[in-house]
């Protein structure tokens, strides 16, 4: 059986009526390192001219398989030590040196008697401890015999635990599948939301192209109406020109008939004059007709050239309009594509900034948490170091007390 010695300080200034709870607290202080500060300071008493510490040693406290029973035995021993302490205080030990050798011898004899009585009580406590250990062993053996009927229960418990484990695994698998499906749905939703701006941009581009087509159709209709009006005006001019030419021909023909009805003279001179006048009139008429025809041809040529130039101008205007509309459409399409690209880049930049901020926040939280843990670990390390130093100091103090106790016992045995 392993044993341990428990030391209880006995203050010299305490009265003989000290309650038992004070000594129990001192025993608990010997078990708890945090309460060792409450131990009273050791004082000195003079016995046979020697300076020694007035400590009372409370014998052997059994430890090991008894557990809580050992604690009870120790408390009983502590109660006996308090009685012994009261007898020691009433035995005549003083804080001042004895005036004579007889008083010293009497004090030593009283101390020897108290120690003999104390050793007897220690042997009695050891017997009580052995009896309690035997009872505890019997109790454990009876408990072990009753535990043999637990085989069926263990089998049922094992099957239940296996079923619970399988159910937990199935639940985890289902939760994993659910999370995967949810992640896929979130991915599709995110893709749909990302494609929405591009869809809107394409719809806007299509609407703008429809507007351009409508404008081109309206301009085409305007040009066609202008061409029709120009054709009508050209036809009207050509008809008016033909009517003017016909009227001129009629006027010329009427004047010739009137001039032919003039009476002709009978003389040669008159005949020659008449022929000359007739031929002059014919020449003038031919000249006028040729001039009119030439003028008509020139006007027709000018009209044809003007019509050709107008047609060429209209065709050039059509080609230029078509090219301009194509350029406008291409520029609008390029502008819309650049706008869509700009919006996509802005969204990408915003997402990158957002994720960067989130990552920085997470890293800051991790750093702060690690710093807090580091501070806590440093504080715990400092506390453990202080507790270790405190325990080492009390260990040294207890070793010195045990050494003084052994020296005292050796001197008592040798005496």
Swiss-Prot record:
Task: Keyword check for Cell division, yes or no.
Answer: no
Chain positions covered by the region annotation Tail: 396-415
Gene name for this UniProt entry? BFSP2
How is this protein situated with respect to the membrane?
Peripheral membrane protein
User: What is the tissue specificity?
Assistant: Abundantly expressed in both the inner and outer cortex of the retina, expressed at a lower level in the nucleus of the retina (at protein level). Detected in eye lens fiber cells (at protein level).
User: Where is it localised?
Assistant: Cell membrane; Cytoplasm; Cytoplasm, Cytoskeleton; Cytoplasm, Cell cortex
Q: Where is the IF rod domain?
A: 104-415
Q: Which PANTHER family match?
A: INTERMEDIATE FILAMENT, PHAKININ
Site Cleavage: give positions: 37-38
Phosphoserine PTM positions read 26, 32, 35, 90, 100
**Sequence positions bearing Phosphothreonine:** 53
Species of origin: Bos taurus (Bovine)
Annotated GO biological processes are:
cell maturation; intermediate filament organization; lens fiber cell development
Quote the InterPro entries the UniProt record gives: IF_rod_dom, Keratin_I
Q: What is its main location?
A: membrane
Q: What does this protein do?
A: Required for the correct formation of lens intermediate filaments as part of a complex composed of BFSP1, BFSP2 and CRYAA. Plays a role in maintenance of retinal lens optical clarity.
Record's subunit section: Part of a complex required for lens intermediate filament formation composed of BFSP1, BFSP2 and CRYAA. Found in a complex composed of PPL (via C-terminal linker domain), BFSP1 and BFSP2 in the retinal lens. Within the complex interacts with PPL (via C-terminal linker domain) and with BFSP1. Identified in a complex that contains VIM, EZR, AHNAK, BFSP1, BFSP2, ANK2, PLEC, PRX and spectrin. Interacts with LGSN. Interacts with VIM.
Query: What PROSITE patterns is this protein classified in?
Result: IF_ROD_2 (PS51842)
Tell me the protein's name: Phakinin
Q: Known SMART domains for this protein?
A: Filament
């Amino acid at each position: 059986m392993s044993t341990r010695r428990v030391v209880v300080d006995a203050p010299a200034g305490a009265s003989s009526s000290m309650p038992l709870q004070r000594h129990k607290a001192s025993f608990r202080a010997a078990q708890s390192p945090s309460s060792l500060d409450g131990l009273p300071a050791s004082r000195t008493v003079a016995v046979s001219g020697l300076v020694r510490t007035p400590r009372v040693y409370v014998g052997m406290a059994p430890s090991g398989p008894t557990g809580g029973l050992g604690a009870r035995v120790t408390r009983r021993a502590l109660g006996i030590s308090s009685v012994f302490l009261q007898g020691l205080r009433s035995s005549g030990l003083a804080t001042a040196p004895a005036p004579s050798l007889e008083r010293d011898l009497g004090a030593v004899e009283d101390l020897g008697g108290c120690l003999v009585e104390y050793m007897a009580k220690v042997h009695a406590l050891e017997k009580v401890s052995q009896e309690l250990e035997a009872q505890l062993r019997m109790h454990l053996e009876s408990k072990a015999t009753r535990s043999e009927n637990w085989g069926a229960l263990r089998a049922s418990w094992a099957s239940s635990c296996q079923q619970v484990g399988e159910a937990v695994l199935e639940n985890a698998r289902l939760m994993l599948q659910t999370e995967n499906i949810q992640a896929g749905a979130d991915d599709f939703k995110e893709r749909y939301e990302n494609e929405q701006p591009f869809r809107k941009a394409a719809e806007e581009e299509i609407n703008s192209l429809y507007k351009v087509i409508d404008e081109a159709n309206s301009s085409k209709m305007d040009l066609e109406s202008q061409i029709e009006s120009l054709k009508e005006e050209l036809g009207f001019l050509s008809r008016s020109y033909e009517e003017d030419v016909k009227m001129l021909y009629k006027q010329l023909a009427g004047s010739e008939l009137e001039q032919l009805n003039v009476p002709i003279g009978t003389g040669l001179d008159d005949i020659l004059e008449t022929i000359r006048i007739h031929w002059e009139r014919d020449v003038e008429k031919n000249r006028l007709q040729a001039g009119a025809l030439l003028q008509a041809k020139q006007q027709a040529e000018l009209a044809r050239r003007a019509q050709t130039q107008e047609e060429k101008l209209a065709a050039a205007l059509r080609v230029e309009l078509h090219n301009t509309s194509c350029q406008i459409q291409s520029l609008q399409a390029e502008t819309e594509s650049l706008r869509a690209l700009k919006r996509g880049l802005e969204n990408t930049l915003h997402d990158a900034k957002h994720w960067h901020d989130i990552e920085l926040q997470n890293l800051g939280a991790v750093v702060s948490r690690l710093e807090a843990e580091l501070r806590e670990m440093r504080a715990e390390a400092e506390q453990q170091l202080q507790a270790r130093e405190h325990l080492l100091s009390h260990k040294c103090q207890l070793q010195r007390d045990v050494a003084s106790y052994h020296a005292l016992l050796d001197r008592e045995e040798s005496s």
